[in-house]
Regions:
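Extended, highly charged clamp/arch subdomains and adjacent linkers
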Residues: 1-204, 462, 466-472
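Long, contiguous domain-sized segments
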Residues: 126, 133-140, 148-472
């Protein structure tokens, strides 16, 4: 390996980054080495990595299905070229714009930006400007919009076929509205009415046309809410063997009360199902029933053939108390089905870019796996994308994954090489199948899903606390 030196060893806020770089270097190159520089540039020549530490996932596992039978490897280009794999039950969406008073032209322009939905997810956007709602961008906004939504005239359009889009001012005016949690309040209200919600969209994103860049991501998330699937792995390697779960828990920075969330996944066409998000004290009361339903669904799908293992994805920095709780809930099931714990961590903050100096962007191709220790791996899930026009280069930072068997006594044991290979392929496909971002979400689908469940629940909890304090 080689190290690019820019200056002496850093100190202060860069010390932790420097130590992390040294740790990664030591794990990948046991013979030794040093790292320095600020910003940190670390070159790991893959040709110098011992063969048993370097693996490559086959190209067939990178293939995604779009439309009826089209196959692509890039989510954005595949969705824009072929459309969704499994359209939702909606064939048209009635858009209702919630816009600042005096910004009707901006709302009309935003409506026009939604026109590609017809080709992306087989949904035709329609709307009636007479039913759009203008609001004053001040402290009255929440009350005005809440009253307007509750008193909207009855129409023939089912609630599930209506989409509400919140447009907010740019700059300080938007900050004031968000400080009053306007978007959170409206999302909760709209979802309680059985409709769909997108927001908050700033005016500058509408006027500059920047929203068009994000429309494929918005479209893919909308389609999932409508019961469809924007794309899925052409052949999911673990479909007939593994029951998969994602687990997340809240942090004190999100809310004082602790919440936990879990979801289950097996068939790509079904996506995440049997979601559960509860306060930690109540979570254990519902977990067993959700797991039982997911297990029975697997048996139904596979003619009473049970899963060979349960793979649980969680964050690597999961608090110790939450990890112990997860282990306590899972141990009773380890006798019925082997449990594999996959702890993942995004490495984007480590700023380690120069893994392969001879490759485009100094990044190895998607599907590259670098073994750090017996149970820890660096998994590259996306290819480097160079800068194009106004778009910056996309560096696909690797996902750090720690894989262990959960034993009946609560201890963790490393997987065999063959078992680890199977779970790494599964994690690779779950990252690529994630509809949260067409340009590549760095987390497996199930973990991104539980993070979103948890984030929305914590936002609602904060809103409930704020309203309670205001009433007192």
């Amino acid at each position: 390996g080689c190290v690019e030196r820019h200056m002496s060893a850093p100190s202060g806020p860069y010390e932790a980054l420097w130590q992390e770089g040294e740790g990664l270097l030591a794990r990948c190159f046991p013979s030794g080495g040093v790292v320095s520089g600020c910003p940190l540039h670390l070159s790991l020549r893959l040709a110098d990595v011992p063969a048993h530490r370097l693996r490559c996932i086959g190209a067939e596992h990178s293939q995604l299905q779009f439309g009826r039978s089209a196959v692509e490897t890039d989510p954005r280009s595949g969705l824009c070229r072929y459309g969704a794999c499994l359209p939702g039950r909606c064939r048209s969406l009635t858009l209702t714009m919630l816009y600042p008073r005096g910004q009707l032209d901006a709302a009309r322009h935003l409506f026009s930006l939604f026109s590609p939905l017809a080709s992306l997810i087989a949904v035709m956007p329609v709307g009636n400007m007479d039913r759009w709602i203008a609001y004053d961008a001040d402290e009255r906004a929440a009350d005005q919009l809440t009253q307007a939504l509750y008193t909207q005239p009855v129409t023939d359009v089912p609630a599930a076929f209506r989409l509400y889009c919140l447009v907010v001012p740019s700059g300080e005016a938007a900050a004031a509205l968000m400080g009053r949690q306007l978007s959170v309040r409206l999302r909760r209200l709209v979802l309680s009415l059985g409709s769909l919600y997108v927001g908050a969209i700033p005016l500058h994103a509408v006027s500059s046309g920047g929203f068009g860049r994000y429309l494929p991501s918005v479209a893919s998330r909308l389609l999932v809410q409508m019961g469809g699937m924007p794309w899925m792995p052409r052949r999911f390697a673990s479909q007939d063997t593994d029951l998969i779960a994602g687990f997340s828990c809240s942090r004190p920075s999100q809310c004082f009360e602790s919440f936990s969330a879990v979801t289950f996944y097996n068939h790509p066409a079904r996506g995440c199902c049997f979601d559960l998000c509860k306060a930690e004290g109540k979570f254990s009361l519902f977990f067993a029933s959700r797991f039982r339903r997911a297990y029975e669904q697997f048996l139904t799908d596979h003619r009473d053939s049970p899963p060979r293992r349960l793979v649980v994805y969680c964050h690597r920095d999961l608090p110790t108390a939450a990890l112990l709780s997860l282990v306590r809930w899972m141990v009773p099931y380890s006798e019925a089905v082997p449990v594999v714990l996959a702890q993942v961590r995004r490495t984007s903050r480590a700023m380690l870019r120069h893994y392969a100096p001879d490759a485009p962007g100094c990044m190895p191709p998607a599907g590259t796996v670098l073994g750090c220790t017996d149970d820890t791996f660096l998994l590259f899930c996306r290819d480097f994308r160079p800068a194009s026009g106004s778009l910056r280069a996309f560096y696909p930072y690797p996902l750090e994954i720690r894989l262990n068997h959960l034993c009946a006594d609560g201890s963790l044991q490393p997987l065999s090489s063959a078992e680890a290979d199977g779970v790494l392929v599964q994690a690779f496909q779950l990252v690529r199948a994630n509809p949260a971002c067409v340009d590549g979400n760095p987390l497996p689908l199930v973990l991104s899903h539980t993070d979103r469940l948890l984030r929305h629940r914590c936002q609602e909890w904060q809103l409930e606390m704020a309203d309670r304090i205001a009433m007192d």
